[in-house]
Amino acid sequence: MMEPAIEPLDRVFLQLGPITIYWYGVIIGTGVLIGLWLATRESVRRGLPKETFVDLVLFAVPIAIVCARAYYVLFEWDYYSKHLAEIPKIWQGGLAIHGGLIGAVATGAVFAQVRGLPFWKLADIAAPSIILGQAIGRWGNFMNQEAHGGPVSREFLENLYLPDWIINQMYINGQYWHPTFLYESLWNLVGFCLLLWLRRVNLRRGELFLSYVIWYSLGRFWIEGMRTDSLMLAEHLRMAQVMSITLIIIALVLWMVRRAKGWARERYMD
């Protein structure tokens, strides 16, 4: 039995003459602004100047976007080498979170050095904002009908008690697909709540950020295995899964070494 015609949600948020504003950018921008608001509130509570994270974001966000796009293009070079004009078109999607994180962390490290601020203190304050921003940002993938998993039936999606507007948006090219964007968004939302709880536990400085890295990477490894559009390092070897395992190992090693060497004496609340 053929499905009735299902139209996807309009990707365009606003059209101003020749200027097109897409939902993808609006949603990612919303995630950044909410994250900035949360980080600014917490930074003031932790005794930092109110403008600290505003200044950091002015550098970190553009660099993170460039790195996220460069990372994606690098692993899709067979395509982009023949379509160079499409490389700047980030509104079509194609921002790799791992690339963005590398850019953001590197920027944060330089920023902390220049401002004379403790890097791990900044990282801990930023961690809940980052994962909440990721939870929000995945809905940009939803609007673009990307970052989905393998084929499923409509009945499968209905059994997840999803509203029709989500189910219909997962109908792409005559087939329903796993809403992996939603799985990751929910995973990150749980991670956000977990980090807020861990903040009250008063871990040693840096360990809240490392907890974020471990939590996000565990979820990303699991969910990436369902996706159909993964960046591939080699045949049957998904780059995001390799990065997730690598980041988990690095985070655990840093956690243990910093404690063993006495490099993590200060607490989050200090």
UniProtKB/Swiss-Prot annotation:
It is found in: Cell membrane. The lineage of its organism: Bacteria, Bacillati, Bacillota, Bacilli, Bacillales. InterPro entries: Lgt (IPR001640). One of its GO terms (cellular component) is plasma membrane. Catalyzes the transfer of the diacylglyceryl group from phosphatidylglycerol to the sulfhydryl group of the N-terminal cysteine of a prolipoprotein, the first step in the formation of mature lipoproteins. It comes from Geobacillus thermodenitrificans (strain NG80-2). The chain crosses the membrane at residues 19-39, 56-76, 94-114, 206-226, 237-257. This is Phosphatidylglycerol--prolipoprotein diacylglyceryl transferase. GO terms for molecular function: phosphatidylglycerol-prolipoprotein diacylglyceryl transferase activity. NCBIfam families: lgt (TIGR00544). GO terms for biological process: lipoprotein biosynthetic process. Its main location: membrane. Belongs to the Lgt family. Pathway: Protein modification; lipoprotein biosynthesis (diacylglyceryl transfer).
